[in-house]
Amino acid sequence: MNPRRKKRLTLAVALIGGVAAITSLLLYALNSNLNLFYTPSEIVHGKTDTGVKPEIGQRIRVGGMVTVGSMVRDPKSLHVQFAVHDSLGGEVLVTYDDLLPDLFREGQGIVAQGVLSADGKLEATEVLAKHDENYMPPEVAEAMGQKHEKLDYSQQKAPDTK
């Protein structure tokens, strides 16, 4: 092989290797920063279309309603544990070691982000509560089968109550 051809081959192999290395590092970075959204039923039973369950140690987001009567606070720390459920009957325990949002209440919708532990609990690093009585995050509303519609205000006057 002449020196010119050898130099071209070396350059081509180095270029292909560099592109492969950059692509693999990029995919690894994207995969580690990916937060997939699951409902409690999907965590328990798997996704409806594929049956895929989240892996232990995977960073996920879970959305649903806080189960009434499930909240347990540790009086000596900020640690709190509560259950999140959806309309399909799935329920997941969530543990959180920080201050809960002011709007957090039992029976209301939340989205919690964290890591799934071996015992099936979500060790949350962030908990988001809904804004007002009508708001629900679109992912949670879609997963729970609810439909967002704009309120229809009529131009009629309210009847007198006297």
Curated annotation (Swiss-Prot):
GO MF annotation: an example: heme binding
Bias (Polar residues) ranges: 153-162
Chain's gene name: ccmE
HAMAP family for the chain: CcmE
Annotated protein name in UniProt: Cytochrome c-type biogenesis protein CcmE
Source organism: Shewanella baltica (strain OS155 / ATCC BAA-1091)
Binding residues annotated for heme, in chain numbering: 131, 135
GO biological process terms, semicolon-separated: cytochrome complex assembly
Annotated family: Belongs to the CcmE/CycJ family.
